[in-house]
Structure formats: C-alpha cells, structure tokens
C-alpha cells in the first residue's frame, strides 16, 4: 500500500466518529497477541496541556537514555507525527506494513474499530515491536473509555488541567469530566495531578483510594519565573534552579511543574533520571503550535488552543509578550466548540479578525464565524481558503506588527504550508 492508500483506509468515512468503549481495540490487539502488555507507559489525560506535558516528559526520558515512544493527537503537519520514537515519526514504510497487517483483522471484526482505535492499535503495536523502554501516551478524549486505556497500569497516570470540553460526551460539570478522566488510574500506578478545585481533586482522590494508587499533586507554590521572552523561559521549581524551556506562557511553566512532579514519581519507582537529563530534556522540548513564533517582521504566532480555557492562556500570553500591540487574528474553529466564550477572551486584544474554515468535517464555516465575530465591533473578513486568509493576514499586518493564528489545531498545518508559498 502507498502512503495515500494507507491514509485513505485509516480515514474511511464509516469509521469516523468517537464511540467510547474498550471492547473493539481489545479484540483487535488480542488478534495481534496483545503487544501493548509488554511495554511500560506514562498515561496522560486532561482538558488542556496534556500534549505539552507529554512532549516534556518524552524529551526528558529520551535525554536520560531511555528509548521513548510518544503517542499524541491530532497531528499538525503529517499523520506520522502522531507516533514517534526518540523524536522520530513512524517511517512511511513501517506505517504501511502495519496497516496491511491490521487491515484484514479489523475488516473481519463484527464490530469494527473506529479510526482512533485503529490508529492507537498501530501505535501500540509499533512501540512494542521496537522494544521501547517506555511510552508517553496521550489520551484522545476523556480517559476511562478512551481507546488508549486498553494499556496495562502505567508507571504514572497524569491528569493535567481539567475544564469543560467535549461536554456532550464527558459530562456537563468539571467534576463529571474529572471522574471520566480519572478512569486511567489503575491499581499499581502512581497518579499525578495538576492542582485544581477541591471538589475536582476529591473526585480524583476517590478514584485513587479505590485503586489503591498514591496521589501526588504538583506544587505551584514551588514554581517561579526567572526570565521570560519570546525566545523562551527560565524558571525554578523546588530544588531545580535555572531550568530552560522553549515553550512560552505561564501555563507552560505549570505544565512543566506537572512533568517534573511525574519525573520525581518515576525516580521513586526506580527509573534513573538525573538532573542533567531534566535540564537537557526540558531545554530541547519541541511542541509545535503552542504560542509558537514562526516568523518575524511581522511576528506570526501559531496557537492551537481550541476551548475557553486555552483562550484564557492565549490572551494572557499576548498581554505578557505583546503588551499594547494591536493583533491581527486569523482564526477558524470547530462548530461543536464553545466558541462564544473562546472569542470573549480574545476579542479585546484583536485589531481585526480574518476567518477561515479548518479542514475538518466538524468545522464551522468561515462566513458563519465572521457573522458571529462582528458582534465585537472589530473589522472582520471571511476568506474562502486558508491560503487566501494567510495572504490577507500578511497584507493587513505591518512589518512591526503581530498576527496570531488560532482556534483549532486542525488549522495550523495549512497555515504553515500557506506561509511557505506566499
């Protein structure tokens, strides 16, 4: 199979959508001899920050000398990014071979796997066959009934910042969502939690007590910023002084605190991770599309924030790094997001909006988004294509100005490709 044929099969229309439950992926992996049971894991869930936290953890573990797998979603530039070993995406020929192997197994299942379940099975099989020492595995959505929860008890079950998102599936309260996400906590693991409201923390604590799993909460009081510019951050956390992190924004320091707390938990469980590996790993962390500066003159920033909590962080970062600067906002969003609350955060900082339609079946049409954004009293232009939107953004932004591309991770890859062509 060619790569195009592989991706066409993976994205088959009849497999689209999310169907919670572990029976299908468990059956599929069982047909392969359950390769997922032969690997160690860090399992990471949360509403915001889980991808960045995964990237930091994988980078530190790699710096410590461990063969480290990383499983995340969605991708920005190429599908292969979703599964990596030591920072390298799965090769095209390996991906093709795995799909050719799994295809007949999946096709003969009475209850066939969803797209996410198939992709997860591919990743878990690859990591096992490559004999990874440890895999950092990001939950797709929720936790308890997410396909990634087919893995055995992880070394650490990490819960990043929890808020309201995917409410039609996960629940309408933060506590209900936390209960679903806490489903990744299993007997034999150690849970790590981003500090949260007492009612939410109690939900997680109840799950930990039920599973007999110890719980460690990251200590944000031990976190302090030393230096913060568009080139990166220097910070202290507990005994760690002068740590460097290329990811920008105060929210990334809090994510780093969760990652460092997880590293301490791994040490308690016998993993050898020295301070030099921590320093090197954090300094080398790469996670595109999170307040990422991709061009200067004008300054162009990509941010994949896609819910109100993300927009709070984005707005805070704009105020911190670009105080008083008018910002051109190129944006697109998925229709099922709470985009009203999202743009309430961003509108006061926007000089103008340019709307586009992300390449996703759930995308809100650019014209409909433009009509909504006009309520904020700022100039709004709807563009028929992302490339047209990027051209308009560059025309509307002076050389000493700033443009922010945001609203959906599904938008960013096309923005970068368009920037390379205009």
Task: Label the model's feature ranges.
Residues 1-48, 52-67, 76-78, 93, ...:
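N-terminal leader/targeting and accessory segments in enzymes
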Residues 18, 22, 26-37, 63-152, ...:
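ATP-dependent carboxylate-amine ligase catalytic core
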Residues 194-207, 211-216, 230-234, 299-302, ...:
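C-terminal helical cap/extension that packs against the catalytic core
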Residues 38, 134-137, 145-158, 162-166, ...:
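Nucleotide phosphate-binding/pyrophosphate-handling subdomain across enzymes
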Residues 110, 118, 131-138, 154-242, ...:
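Acidic, Mg2+-coordinating active-site environments of NTP-dependent enzymes
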Residues 57-62, 127, 266, 346, ...:
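Hydrophobic alpha-helical packing residues
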Residues 408:
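Active-site-proximal loop/hinge segments that shape catalytic or ion-binding/gating pockets
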């Amino acid at each position: 199979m060619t790569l195009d044929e592989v991706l066409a099969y993976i994205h088959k229309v009849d497999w689209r959508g999310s169907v919670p439950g572990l029976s299908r992926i468990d059956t599929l992996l069982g047909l392969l001899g359950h390769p997922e049971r032969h690997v160690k894991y860090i399992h990471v869930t949360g509403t915001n920050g889980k991808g960045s936290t995964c990237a930091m953890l994988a980078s530190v573990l790699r710096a410590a000398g461990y063969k480290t797998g990383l499983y995340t979603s969605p991708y920005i530039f190429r599908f292969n990014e979703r599964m990596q070993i030591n920072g390298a995406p799965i090769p095209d020929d390996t991906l093709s071979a795995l799909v050719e192997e799994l295809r007949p197994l999946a096709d003969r299942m009475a209850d066939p796997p969803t797209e996410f379940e198939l992709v997860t099975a591919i990743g878990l099989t690859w990591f096992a066959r490559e004999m990874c020492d440890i895999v950092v595995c990001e939950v797709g959505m929720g936790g308890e009934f997410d396909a990634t929860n087919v893995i055995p008890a992880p070394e650490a079950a990490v819960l990043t910042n929890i808020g309201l998102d995917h409410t039609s599936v996960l629940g309408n309260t933060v506590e209900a969502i936390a209960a679903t996400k806490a489903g990744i906590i299993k007997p034999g693991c150690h849970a790590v939690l981003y500090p949260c409201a007492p009612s939410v923390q109690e939900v997680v604590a109840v799950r930990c007590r039920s599973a007999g799993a110890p719980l460690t909460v990251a200590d944000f009081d031990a976190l302090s910023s030393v230096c913060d510019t568009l080139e990166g951050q220097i910070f202290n956390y507990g005994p760690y002084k002068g740590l460097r992190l290329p990811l920008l924004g105060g929210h990334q320091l809090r994510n780093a605190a969760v990652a460092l707390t997880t590293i301490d938990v791994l040490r308690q469980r016998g993993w050898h991770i020295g301070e030099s590996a921590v320093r090197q790993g954090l300094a080398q962390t790469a996670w595109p599309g999170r307040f990422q500066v991709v061009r200067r003159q004008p300054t162009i920033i990509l941010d994949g924030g896609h819910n109100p909590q993300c927009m709070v962080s984005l707005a805070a970062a704009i105020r911190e790094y670009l105080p008083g600067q008018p910002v051109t906002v190129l944006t697109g969003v998925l229709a099922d997001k709470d985009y009203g609350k999202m743009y309430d955060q961003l509108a006061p900082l926007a000089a103008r909006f340019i709307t586009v339609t992300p390449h996703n079946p759930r995308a809100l049409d650019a014209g409909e988004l433009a009509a909504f954004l006009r309520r904020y009293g700022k100039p709004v232009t709807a563009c028929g294509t992302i490339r047209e939107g990027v051209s308009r953004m560059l025309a509307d932004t002076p050389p000493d100005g700033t443009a922010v591309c945001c609203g959906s991770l599904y938008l960013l890859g096309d923005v970068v490709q368009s920037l390379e062509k205009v």
